[in-house]
């Protein structure tokens, strides 16, 4: 599985090692192609410590043997192929040993690397030295040691040259400059200077066959070589040799490699069983790809990912023109043995430096003949628009619709899958696929399913993934536990407040209903009846004695001396009292007898005077019936 990723901050190597030990998820060795391989064998991820290339002679051909050491299973895998003797120096051996990923401090990973190869005439040996500077924060390791020895004779004159190594498949990796020098053994008459050899080559005095037979070779394979090691079971190795004529920048410079034709170089590679050769000419360059398969049959799955050529949010602000990205194939077998893959990219048949312009946007070349050497250097490329490249892998199908890998470690089970994320920020948005590992406890019952759609998240999640903060299961557990506590507290507080409010409201409403006073009012029909009765009731003032009309005064008693005239001897008070007594008394109630009034009575009824006045029977003031009552 090849996956796009980058690191912009130096992650803690201790946390990375602990995560590798706990979850058995070992990130592969990150090559210059900005790719990370993730192992399909989570239970037993292989970790390759070193890779060696042995070159031996057999029947005028060189046998290139590649050996990979697996420090996990303490096993090694060896693959051999035959190459013509003209490609490599006579009897040389090269070892490429990148250090283990766990032992490399992140801060010491070099940004640029310089390899110097010098030859010693007396000892007939080639000395290799390497210098590197570190400021690039990622898992890209350029540490390598290349040793080469030669058994052939070294002429008195040695050619020292310098060239710039191509950054490989990743254009955004800082440029790596490699300088080397090698001896030349040839049947051609010795020359005194580099310029004379250059003139011989430019005048075509040396034929192509003469060049091949004279073994005029330079370690061109070191000019632009990259070793791609996947430490976690991706089981693929790529050794790229870029044969380019960057040794020359003018028509008078050395043009040794330009005499080697494409057809002669292609014929030097012998087809192995189950191998394929791909030739894709591009102008003056050809690409040869030899892919050897294991003897045991294995099921292959292919997946394709489109990755940007620039690391998002990296410290570098420069863009590099990317190389034509080859298709990297890898396969696994039942014994997790390593398969080798050889990709010879950029075979140049031109003696000019035009091929180097394909790899770099701008370059500055300088040539000097001091101490018989040529030095080439190139400035930092200019900024161009980014492009995308497609990398195909046949190792394991872990795309969005791919399978989910599981591994049991202790009391936990781990699920690993590839999830596509849409990272959004304030100024940029990009889409990337990230490997995700989810852990569950074996004692708990759970159901796990991989998200099927693209997850949109912010830049904070992406930075946490790069720094390794998401790799700690304990930290995630603590965060989730704290989040659950906070959420529970908030929900409990809200629910408690609602319950208290409901209780208070219930008692308040109940008390209000109990003490509520209803207002009384008369029915309209009854009000009309009462009003009518008040006006027409004859007995309304029956018991109101103050408004009752007093009865009339009874007539005065008979006085024999003077009828109708009160005696003079009676005072005013007696007159009034008698009058009052007569007024409110009936005749029948007086003490006098009816004989006393018989003489003076002129009518059937004698009406007494009112207020001492004699009433007239002709015009009575009161009605007859009223008087009787």
From Swiss-Prot:
Residues 533-543 have a biased composition (Low complexity). Residues 365-384, 529-572, 591-618 are annotated as: Disordered. It is a single-pass membrane protein. Keywords: Glycoprotein, Membrane, Transmembrane, Transmembrane helix, Vacuole. It is found in: Vacuole membrane. The keyword Transmembrane helix applies. Coiled coil: none annotated. Glycans are attached at residues 4, 70, 203, 242, 249, 282, 315, 333, 375, 478. The chain crosses the membrane at residues 489-509. Belongs to the TDA7 family. This is Topoisomerase I damage affected protein 7. The gene is TDA7.
């Amino acid at each position: 599985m090849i996956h796009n990723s980058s690191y912009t901050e130096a992650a803690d190597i201790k946390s990375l090692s602990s995560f590798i030990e706990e979850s058995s998820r070992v990130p592969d060795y990150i090559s210059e192609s900005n790719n990370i391989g993730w192992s399909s064998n989570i239970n037993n991820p292989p970790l390759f410590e070193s890779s060696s290339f042995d070159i031996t002679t057999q029947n005028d051909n060189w046998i290139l043997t590649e050996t990979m050491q697996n420090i996990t299973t303490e096993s090694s895998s060896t693959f051999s192929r035959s190459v013509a003797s003209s490609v490599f120096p006579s009897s040389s051996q090269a070892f490429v040993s990148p250090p283990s990923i766990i032992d490399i401090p992140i801060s010491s990973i070099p940004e640029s690397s310089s390899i110097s190869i010098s030859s010693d005439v007396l000892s007939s040996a080639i000395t290799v030295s390497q210098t590197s500077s570190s400021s690039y924060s990622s898992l890209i390791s350029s540490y390598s040691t290349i040793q080469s020895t030669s058994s052939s004779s070294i002429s008195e004159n040695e050619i020292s040259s310098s060239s710039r190594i191509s950054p490989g498949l990743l254009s955004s990796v800082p440029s790596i400059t490699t300088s080397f020098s090698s001896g030349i053994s040839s049947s051609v008459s010795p020359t005194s200077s580099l310029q004379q050899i250059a003139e011989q080559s430019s005048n075509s005095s040396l034929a192509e066959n003469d060049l091949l037979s004279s073994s005029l070779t330079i370690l061109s394979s070191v000019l632009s070589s990259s070793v791609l090691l996947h430490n976690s079971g991706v089981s693929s190795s790529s050794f790229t040799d870029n044969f380019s004529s960057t040794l020359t920048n003018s028509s008078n410079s050395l043009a040794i490699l330009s005499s080697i034709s494409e057809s002669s170089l292609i014929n030097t590679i012998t087809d192995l069983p189950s191998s394929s050769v791909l030739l894709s000419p591009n102008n003056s360059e050809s690409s040869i790809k030899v892919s050897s398969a294991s003897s045991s049959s294995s099921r292959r799955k292919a997946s394709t990912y489109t990755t940007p050529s620039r690391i998002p949010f990296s410290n570098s602000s420069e863009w590099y023109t990317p190389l034509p990205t080859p298709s990297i194939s890898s396969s696994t077998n039942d014994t997790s043995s390593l398969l080798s893959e050889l990709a010879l990219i950029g075979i140049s048949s031109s003696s000019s430096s035009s091929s180097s312009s394909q790899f770099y946007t701008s370059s500055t070349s300088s040539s000097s003949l001091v101490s018989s050497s040529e030095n080439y250097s190139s400035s930092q490329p200019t900024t161009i628009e980014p492009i995308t490249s497609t990398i195909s892998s046949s190792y394991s199908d872990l795309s969005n619709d791919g399978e989910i890998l599981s591994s049991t470690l202790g009391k936990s089970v781990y699920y690993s899958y590839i999830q596509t994320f849409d990272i959004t920020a304030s100024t940029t948005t990009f889409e990337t696929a990230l490997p995700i590992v989810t852990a569950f406890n074996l004692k708990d019952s759970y159901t796990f399913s991989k998200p099927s759609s693209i997850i949109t998240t912010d830049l904070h999640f992406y930075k946490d993934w790069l720094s390794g903060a998401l790799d700690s299961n304990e930290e995630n557990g603590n965060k989730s536990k704290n989040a659950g506590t906070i959420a529970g507290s908030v929900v409990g507080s809200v629910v408690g407040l609602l319950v208290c409010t409901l209780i208070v409201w219930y008692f308040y409403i109940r008390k209000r209903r109990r003490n509520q006073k209803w207002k009384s009012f008369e029915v309209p029909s009854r009000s009309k009846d009462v009003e009518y009765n008040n006006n027409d009731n004859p007995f309304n003032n029956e018991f109101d004695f103050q408004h009752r009309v007093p009865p009339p005064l009874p007539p005065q008693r008979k006085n024999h001396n003077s009828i109708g005239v009160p005696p003079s001897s009676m005072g005013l008070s007696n007159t009034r009292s008698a009058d009052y007594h007569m007024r409110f008394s009936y005749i029948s109630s007086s003490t006098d007898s009816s004989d006393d009034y018989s003489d003076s009575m002129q009518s059937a009824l004698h009406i007494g005077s009112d207020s001492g006045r004699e009433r007239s029977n002709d015009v009575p003031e009161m009605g007859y019936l009223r008087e009787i009552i």
